[in-house]
Amino acid sequence: MSIPENAIAVVGMAGRFPGAKDVSAFWSNLRRGKESIVTLSEQELRDAGVSDKTLADPAYVRRAPLLDGIDEFDAGFFGFPPLAAQVLDPQHRLFLQCAWHALEDAGADPARFDGSIGVYGTSSPSGYLLHNLLSHRDPNAVLAEGLNFDQFSLFLQNDKDFLATRISHAFNLRGPSIAVQTACSSSLVAVHLACLSLLSGECDMALAGGSSLCIPHRVGYFTSPGSMVSAVGHCRPFDVRADGTVFGSGVGLVVLKPLAAAIDAGDRIHAVIRGSAINNDGSAKMGYAAPNPAAQADVIAEAHAVSGIDSSTVSYVECHGTGTPLGDPIEIQGLRAAFEVSQTSRSAPCVLGSVKSNIGHLEVAAGIAGLIKTILCLKNKALPATLHYTSPNPELRLDQSPFVVQSKYGPWECDGVRRAGVSSFGVGGTNAHVVLEEAPAEASEVSAHAEPAGPQVILLSAQTAAALGESRTALAAALETQDGPRLSDVAYTLARRRKHNVTMAAVVHDREHAATVLRAAEHDNVFVGEAAHDGEHGDRADAAPTSDRVVFLFPGQGAQHVGMAKGLYDTEPVFAQHFDTCAAGFRDETGIDLHAEVFDGTATDLERIDRSQPALFTVEYALAKLVDTFGVRAGAYIGYSTGEYIAATLAGVFDLQTAIKTVSLRARLMHESPPGAMVAVALGPDDVTQYLPPEVELSAVNDPGNCVVAGPKDQIRALRQRLTEAGIPVRRVRATHAFHTSAMDPMLGQFQEFLSRQQLRPPRTPLLSNLTGSWMSDQQVVDPASWTRQISSPIRFADELDVVLAAPSRILVEVGPGGSLTGSAMRHPKWSTTHRTVRLMRHPLQDVDDRDTFLRALGELWSAGVEVDWTPRRPAVPHLVSLPGYPFARQRHWVEPNHTVWAQAPGANNGSPAGTADGSTAATVDAARNGESQTEVTLQRIWSQCLGVSSVDRNANFFDLGGDSLMAISIAMAAANEGLTITPQDLYEYPTLASLTAAVDASFASSGLAKPPEAQANPAVPPNVTYFLDRGLRDTGRCRVPLILRLDPKIGLPDIRAVLTAVVNHHDALRLHLVGNDGIWEQHIAAPAEFTGLSNRSVPNGVAAGSPEERAAVLGILAELLEDQTDPNAPLAAVHIAAAHGGPHYLCLAIHAMVTDDSSRQILATDIVTAFGQRLAGEEITLEPVSTGWREWSLRCAALATHPAALDTRSYWIENSTKATLWLADALPNAHTAHPPRADELTKLSSTLSVEQTSELDDGRRRFRRSIQTILLAALGRTIAQTVGEGVVAVELEGEGRSVLRPDVDLRRTVGWFTTYYPVPLACATGLGALAQLDAVHNTLKSVPHYGIGYGLLRYVYAPTGRVLGAQRTPDIHFRYAGVIPELPSGDAPVQFDSDMTLPVREPIPGMGHAIELRVYRFGGSLHLDWWYDTRRIPAATAEALERTFPLALSALIQEAIAAEHTEHDDSEIVGEPEAGALVDLSSMDAG
């Protein structure tokens, strides 16, 4: 076939025209002679804002060519935030969507196209900008004070200059990108310029077209005598009644390539552009807007000359044809002049037509509409009618020309090649003419080759699940048509010629089957990518996994079966080629004909080792080579027994010939070994040992609960009987020998001697070892002894799985018969829903086609995100076919016009983004008061307004949300208006809301405005005290903890006062009271002085000393005294005496929780007892010194907050604060309640474990080397999972804050509240093994830095991080393990600490804003649990279920862990616990 040198192929096209949603509907309307200019009802016009005065005007024409859906756009598909989409000119939006459909029609994926792609486009002036956007502001002020950024941004999104470059940016096109503006001829000029660019080599493919919208849209127009618009609302080109045109809306594009390149690429060619030309009228005409017939004739003649054709061969001309009395005669005059230069007589007249009679004048898109119409005429070999043509305008003098007007639909009769001209003339004089020719016969005809036999893989892509569903339905409909495309061509077009995002693969057999599968909601032959289920926009390019996720598994002995892979051998030449190569090698080594053995042999023969191992090697090697041709690569290999040799060969350890020799020798020597038997047992390796006779050995561990044992046949038979009687599942393994046991020892020397003479190389792909269960080192791989030991050693397949499944989202591909290895993987404890298995071959019992199974596997891999090269599936004669385009989401993005007031347009408001809603500042203040960061709230609001979304995920990337450099400028300007200093560059460095907030706050903190805490006379409160006060949840006066001592009645008040004076003066925290001012708290510490604050109450008369009644009376007095402490400004420590009659008195120190912790109570008890001893002995009271007092500690907190050790933990706390996925308040019926509970809204449930159950807990601690806290938290996770649901719950823990970050701070003897509070994520799951659950909690706690000290410092002292952490939700659960409460000491000492008396009143009621507070402590040898719950948030039934389930879950956890006990923990992980003899010493507790 001769290819014209300058010919350009139209390989793709798309458009939306009045009354037509796509090109197919457009042709249907043309063929039926449908006019798409409609009459508008009075109500429609009123709704559009047309006034009654206008409606009454006789000059107002109520007609318009309407385009549906101009307000709709799939913003997510193109990466536009909602607000940006709303402001973007709809002409640009439609052009974007049509450009994508045109590329799809061309079978061109820009990301895979090997060359540059240019864009030549045009749009009309933006009526949307003028009528809609700018109607919201004072037009006199738009530019009154000069251009500002937001005006520039607004014009940038609406001006016609940016149409083409917007396409290039959206699709990452690197060729020329030119906006063309020549008025009505613009889009045809764009086609001409694109052709020149292709011919000059500037680009290899080009998009060309135009977009024009009349806005306001659903309105008519005014006419007047002599105007160019029709008074009747009909466009009647060439007709005697022609009185003007009707302007309408539309968009169209074509995709162009050099004809030779299109043919070479196998493109579908719609038509050929033989040549084109443009020129201008100049001034030789009646006026600027008037046409020039001579210039029009010149441009047509030049186009003919460029095309190298004679005008007599042009049988149709799509005219500019506006239907105006002036324009039509001039156009025919020019045509006559151009065509009369021909020296060849015509055999038939040239037909004229004008699409404007159907759809009106589309302004800048008029030329592309005419071009697409003409291309459709060429494709269909038919000419539609030019509507409303009854008799010619006599001014045309058609009877004196070679032209006739097509007045009805009919075939395009032509003696030779069909050729056509398309004209478009612009106001201002730029004329364009294009010569079209029908596509070459070879390119236009569907291949005559028969449909290839066998299954096909259909691939579909979409960015949302909804779009995928629409695509499936549309493709099914296309396949169901009578003249639908060949299935192989559909598969080729979708696989090789479409861009893929979220994916779906379907294996189908014919068109009918394909349609059925596509329409089915679920089908075994359909595989859908995970992202397509969630309905969110996503891009495969961003989420596509690498080959590192893929692991190939090669099965061994026992997987073989007769006929395996026969279907692949018969249908896949690559498989057959490699099978034949291996079979020939094994025949030379062994004399065995594998073709006969594998495809036609018997099962008994194939079970022989000397046959099965070569057969498996051959099949699996050929299968691996076949899958390799599809581009599927693995990041690692695991081979099972014989399979390890296949893996090593593919990894390059053995060359193929060496591998064949090695496997042949190994199989022969194994076959010659003593016979034996093997069975698979449903027990773990430790449990099965007790059942094994002496000569039966462990052969393989496939998963922790299943293993294989082997030995002599008689002993295996007896073992099977014993296991069956014990109710333990056992099954025979198809093996004739006791593989991987000492029974193989006799062959080892000969095998190792052979291997030592072979050359082994380090692997190109990582290998896992059967011998060690871990990665093979290069040294191990090349060591013959390792390969020899593998023969007689158990296969540690479970350990190999343990290694690969530790990584998330692994895809395990079984490269061999059946699915035994992937089945073991799915039973492994580390298997999760993020992992996937794929089997390349069928199970022997499945009656399915081998190739069907293989293609299903490829489809499943592809849908999982693995790159698959579908080239091997390309038909012998591939043919690109037309298929439905992407179903864009029809979402409205529109700003309605405002005809009454001037306000600010969205996205254009005098220098800042869309205006702040009333009350936003108040909302910010409220948010700040609720503990949220004011900076973040402000930035959240700015981002939301600029992006046009209601909320912004604080960890979402600004640019992933659709942000760009211009929007970054908008955000910086809006932030400046809020008093925040941000540069556009900051958005690149800190692209998330969280990171930007931290950066802004850090900048503020470094500005030097903060007053150093050391300069303050009264120090600010430390972070944990701030935690208490910041929430404002409890009456600070009531939150007191008692410290109770029994005193001998002979101890008098002077002694008590002396002791108290010494102790209170020794510890400054006991002289503390807080002063609050507008939410800012200071600590005031009184000077040392004699202690006078002592109250005295007596037990009522008649109560016997030492009786239970006396103790109850004392407790009542103490509880009453504690309740009386309601003055928030009073000192935080008070002392009371409860005097008994004749028995001991009780001294109660009521100390506020904010100045004492468990260690403080121990220090105070020791000091008081010491002081009493010294006083009663007549000695001076001298207490052990305090190194760092409370006041000094408080002053140092600010410095500690900026200590590197604290700052280094920022990322840890920020990351961990967002891990929770389960919130009790959300998972349970009651809504989340932000306000703190009152005392009467809290309820306590208590339970006690028996001494025996508590001992069991101690035994578990010693066995597993895990702390009591770890075991209790693991049980709590199980309890929540069983009663509420599975997920990750945020739990607040308490830590010991006395281990500080600076060596010059010593708090070991300091009285004060140093408890740290910090959140940890707790996984709540029911399916996790006990040891795994303990390990998970242990690792979580072990990762907590510095006992959680840094969290409080960063949360309450270091402002930048404080705002970030403060925005996080309060954990639902507070958990505290208080350790051992010592029992009442015996003896007659005059002063004794009374823990037994303290216990009932020692803790204040909770109220820190948690839904549940669980307090656990040891007392009297038993474990006690107090469940406090907020009755507004937690139903009583749920709380009772938690309280009831916890002991059961704890016991089950310990029992399970003991059953699966292991001792692999490092000694460094042994953790201590508070034990008897210490009140509570949290500093002795490790983190996990």
UniProtKB/Swiss-Prot annotation:
Keyword Coiled coil: no
Keywords assigned: Acetylation, Fatty acid metabolism, Lipid metabolism, Multifunctional enzyme, NADP, Oxidoreductase, Phosphopantetheine, Phosphoprotein, Transferase
Assembly and binders: The C-terminal region interacts with TesA. Interacts with MmpL7.
Catalytic activity: icosanoyl-[(phenol)carboxyphthiodiolenone synthase] + 2 (S)-methylmalonyl-CoA + 3 malonyl-CoA + 5 NADPH + 10 H(+) = C32-carboxyphthiodiolenone-[(phenol)carboxyphthiodiolenone synthase] + 5 CO2 + 5 NADP(+) + 5 CoA + 2 H2O; docosanoyl-[(phenol)carboxyphthiodiolenone synthase] + 2 (S)-methylmalonyl-CoA + 3 malonyl-CoA + 5 NADPH + 10 H(+) = C34-carboxyphthiodiolenone-[(phenol)carboxyphthiodiolenone synthase] + 5 CO2 + 5 NADP(+) + 5 CoA + 2 H2O; 17-(4-hydroxyphenyl)heptadecanoyl-[(phenol)carboxyphthiodiolenone synthase] + 2 (S)-methylmalonyl-CoA + 3 malonyl-CoA + 5 NADPH + 10 H(+) = C35-(phenol)carboxyphthiodiolenone-[(phenol)carboxyphthiodiolenone synthase] + 5 CO2 + 5 NADP(+) + 5 CoA + 2 H2O; 19-(4-hydroxyphenyl)nonadecanoyl-[(phenol)carboxyphthiodiolenone synthase] + 2 (S)-methylmalonyl-CoA + 3 malonyl-CoA + 5 NADPH + 10 H(+) = C37-(phenol)carboxyphthiodiolenone-[(phenol)carboxyphthiodiolenone synthase] + 5 CO2 + 5 NADP(+) + 5 CoA + 2 H2O
Acyltransferase: annotated span: 551-868
Function: Part of the PpsABCDE complex involved in the biosynthesis of the lipid core common to phthiocerols and phenolphthiocerols by successive additions of malonyl-CoA or methylmalonyl-CoA extender units. PpsA can accept as substrate the activated forms of either icosanoyl (C20), docosanoyl (C22) or lignoceroyl (C24) groups from FadD26, or a (4-hydroxyphenyl)-C17 or (4-hydroxyphenyl)-C19 fatty acyl from FadD29. PpsA initiates the biosynthesis and extends its substrate using a malonyl-CoA extender unit. The PpsB and PpsC proteins add the second and third malonyl-CoA extender units.
Binding site for NADP(+): 1286-1331
Listed name of the protein: Phenolphthiocerol/phthiocerol polyketide synthase subunit E
Species this protein is from: Mycobacterium tuberculosis (strain ATCC 25618 / H37Rv)
Transmembrane stretches, start-end: none
Modified residues (O-(pantetheine 4'-phosphoryl)serine): S965
Record CDD domains: PKS (cd00833)
Gene label: ppsE
Enzyme Commission number(s): 2.3.1.292
